[in-house]
Amino acid sequence: MENKNVYSLVVAILNRGFSDVAMSAARNAGAKGGTVISARSSGLHEEETFFGISILPEKELVLILSTEETKAPIMRAIIKHVGIETEGGGIIFSLPVTDVEGIKAFEDFSKKQ
């Protein structure tokens, strides 16, 4: 049985302060909106300290629910404006979404399918 995903979750992990740029680019590429979450980086790099206090790099996560058709243009727009080679330092990826409830625009789209 084939499971065709109609939706994707586009995830962008950005340096703090670049979520507005990412959302503007995504909207211009077809996104209807998104969610921004504040985060801290934790990984391979040693923590910086300032007067003995650990300072972790601040990040922002941008989450955008998109249709499969708008996923690639949204990702390309975000990469162009805040990708890894820009000051935004963005890492962008997508995940398949199997079910969506409670979002009118997506519910209307599903009824057309």
What does each model-found stretch correspond to?
Residues 1-113:
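Positively charged, small/polar-rich N-terminal and surface patches that mediate targeting and assembly
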